[in-house]
Regions:
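Transmembrane alpha-helices and adjacent helix-loop boundaries
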Residues: 1-237
Length: 237
């Protein structure tokens, strides 16, 4: 890396053979790698949108910012991200989602799938331990089926197979379909991690909470989930 050749000159790359990497393609196609097929003159928009999202991701890792206002910040940043990337107002050129790519799309897919999948994973983990056979069976089938399918297959089905089963004239944007597929896939894996934390808690705590007259959701919110989630933080990270 230290002796890498950033030029696209074949002669310079041959001279440096065995000393460093030839990164001519990186220098030549850097913008394509970072921003995909987004219009060249408008690439400041994905740069700004990605920077704001990265700053929020970094802030979310600091315990100082763990307040209810952080949820509002996430909603505001996502709204800003989509508005800036799509455009179509205030003189901004409209750019369809099919032309999004590179770093902005990667950050969006990763962050949205994790943020949305986490509460869904909690519900799936609780459902797998439910006393109601119907709920428990449905959660088990969903989790085991999704975990048994590779992510690339989920993305392929969301992108190409799902539209074939849609009613004629009905169309869902490919970005939305991919987000749904990745969210469900992530939720299935997180559900198993969270279920491990739920099983690690002593049953005596739940029995004591029942004896105090607490409802099911009060027990989960105040006793079970805070401890279970704390136990599985290393596995989630």
């Amino acid at each position: 890396v230290w002796y890498a050749i950033p030029d696209a000159d074949n002669a310079a790359c041959r001279e440096a053979y065995g000393l460093g990497a030839c990164w001519g393609v990186v220098a030549e196609k850097g913008r394509l790698i970072l921003f995909g097929r987004y219009p060249f003159d408008e690439q400041w928009r994905p740069l700004v949108a990605s920077s704001v999202l990265v700053v929020l991701l970094a802030a979310s890792c600091l315990k100082t910012f763990w307040r209810p206002a952080l949820i509002g910040a996430w909603v505001a940043v996502y709204a800003f991200f989509f508005a800036l990337m799509l455009g179509g107002f205030a003189g901004l050129t409209y750019v369809e989602t099919a032309r999004w790519g590179g770093l902005p799309l990667t950050l969006l897919l990763a962050s949205v799938s994790l943020v949305v999948a986490f509460p869904l994973a909690i519900l799936l983990a609780l459902g797998r331990q439910s006393n109601l056979p119907a709920i428990r069976t449905l959660c088990v089938i969903f989790v085991e089926f999704v975990r048994g399918v590779p992510l690339i297959s989920v993305l392929f089905m969301a992108s190409f197979i799902l539209p074939l089963f849609m009613p004629q004239g009905t169309q869902i944007d490919v970005l939305v379909r991919v987000l749904i597929g990745m969210t469900l896939f992530t939720a299935a894996y997180l559900a198993e991690v969270i279920r491990g934390g739920l099983q690690a808690l002593p049953k005596g705590q739940v029995e004591a909470a029942h004896s105090l007259g607490l409802t099911y959701w009060q027990i989960q919110r105040m006793i079970v989930l805070p401890q279970a989630l704390r136990l599985v933080v290393p596995a989630i990270v």
